């Protein structure tokens, strides 16, 4: 899929989420193209900064929930990148699955950038949470 088509899909979905979703929902943005993710980050910083928060999950952090809780701006949809670089992603996903109900305390949707490897792990390690997610397929 070319970048123009990816951009149309991602930003159409993001605009829908911004306009229609006013409670927590987890979305997985499936993309293996780091340059497209960076391009999207730049667009969000320039055009969506008032409504979208972009966070980079540290490679050594073991709790996505705590990371988001400590960094979230509750008035903005949150996008998190960096999961593929996490050194203990299996633990991160297993913990997310166990405490999935606590994520519902967040007021707005969260979008996680994932690649095929992380998506496969999500399905295998956090199936209950995965079944409650929406997917933005950019492959």
Segments predicted by a language model, with ranges:
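Short, glycine/charged-enriched secondary-structure capping and boundary segments
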Residues: 43-44, 91-95, 125-129
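Short linear interaction motifs
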Residues: 8-12, 90-101
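Conserved P-loop NTPase "ATPase switch" module shared by AAA+ and STAND
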Residues: 71-92, 96, 105, 109-116
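Extended, compositionally biased accessory segments flanking or bridging domains
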Residues: 1-76
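Arginine/glycine-rich "motif VI" loop of SF2 helicases in the C-terminal RecA-like domain
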Residues: 101-106, 128
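Short acidic, S/G/P-rich loop/turn micro-motifs used as interaction or catalytic elements
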Residues: 33-37, 58-63, 83-90, 117-120
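Conserved beta-strand segments of the P-loop GTPase G domain that flank and frequently precede/overlap
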Residues: 28-31, 54-58, 78-86, 111-114, ...
């Amino acid at each position: 899929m070319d970048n123009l088509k990816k951009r149309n899909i991602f930003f159409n979905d993001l605009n829908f989420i911004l306009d229609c979703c006013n409670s927590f929902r987890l979305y997985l943005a499936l993309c293996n193209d780091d340059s497209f993710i960076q391009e999207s980050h730049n667009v969000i910083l320039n055009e969506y900064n008032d409504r979208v928060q972009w966070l980079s999950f540290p490679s050594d952090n073991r709790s996505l929930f705590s990371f988001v809780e400590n960094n979230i701006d509750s008035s903005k949809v949150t996008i998190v990148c960096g999961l593929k670089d996490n050194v203990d992603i299996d633990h991160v996903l297993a913990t997310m699955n166990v405490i999935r109900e606590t994520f519902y305390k967040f007021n707005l949707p969260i979008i996680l950038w994932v690649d095929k490897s992380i998506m496969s792990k999500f399905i295998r390690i956090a199936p209950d949470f995965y079944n409650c997610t929406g997917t933005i397929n950019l492959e």
